Amino acid sequence: MVDKRESYTKEDLLASSRGELFGAKGPQLPAPNMLMMDRVVKMTETGGNFDKGYVEAELDINPDLWFFGCHFIGDPVMPGCLGLDAMWQLVGFYLGWLGGEGKGRALGVGEVKFTGQVLPTARKVTYRIHFKRIVNRRLIMGLADGEVLVDGRLIYTAHDLKVGLFQDTSAF
């Protein structure tokens, strides 16, 4: 039985990366440095733009984060692909929260737009995931739209984020 809380701490997210949060067969979040959130502040089975589920998570920004030292030297900015990956991470986390089993894999995204950036002077990134559909057949898949905000300002949007849970990834 999945412990379905409305929020999760950094320690909980790290437990997920070790396969301890959603059980031995549940999906895992990546470990640091690829874990792109510090906490999940809200998870619901309803709500969001489509009333089919909503997740909100946060990442605290500080100038010592690993990507600022290499992307780019003299012009530090968080890579946009990390924000996109964070949204995929949260779709997979939600599928585990619903009780889904398997290994999470990003399956695609319909459209991504970047209209801002995350600099080392920022304080907080907020991720918002609005679920459109959950497929729970042979393949468990989540379809959602996502938003990334920095210090309350919308900077990325993604439409039709897709993540699937697979029992066997050898042929993937």
Curated annotation (Swiss-Prot):
The active site is at H71. It is found in: Cytoplasm. GO terms for cellular component: cytoplasm. The keyword DNA-binding does not apply. Necessary for the introduction of cis unsaturation into fatty acids. Catalyzes the dehydration of (3R)-3-hydroxydecanoyl-ACP to E-(2)-decenoyl-ACP and then its isomerization to Z-(3)-decenoyl-ACP. Can catalyze the dehydratase reaction for beta-hydroxyacyl-ACPs with saturated chain lengths up to 16:0, being most active on intermediate chain length. It comes from the Bacteria. It catalyses: a (3R)-hydroxyacyl-[ACP] = a (2E)-enoyl-[ACP] + H2O; (3R)-hydroxydecanoyl-[ACP] = (2E)-decenoyl-[ACP] + H2O; (2E)-decenoyl-[ACP] = (3Z)-decenoyl-[ACP]. Signal peptide: none annotated. InterPro entries: FabA, FabA_FabZ, HotDog_dom_sf. Its EC number is 4.2.1.59, 5.3.3.14. GO terms for biological process: unsaturated fatty acid biosynthetic process. HAMAP family: FabA (MF_00405). Homodimer. This is 3-hydroxydecanoyl-[acyl-carrier-protein] dehydratase. Transmembrane segments: none annotated. It holds the Pfam family FabA. Keywords: Cytoplasm, Fatty acid biosynthesis, Fatty acid metabolism, Isomerase, Lipid biosynthesis, Lipid metabolism, Lyase. Belongs to the thioester dehydratase family. FabA subfamily. It comes from Salmonella choleraesuis (strain SC-B67). Pathway: Lipid metabolism; fatty acid biosynthesis. PANTHER family: 3-HYDROXYACYL-[ACYL-CARRIER-PROTEIN] DEHYDRATASE, 3-HYDROXYDECANOYL-[ACYL-CARRIER-PROTEIN] DEHYDRATASE. GO terms for molecular function: (3R)-hydroxyacyl-[acyl-carrier-protein] dehydratase activity; trans-2-decenoyl-acyl-carrier-protein isomerase activity.
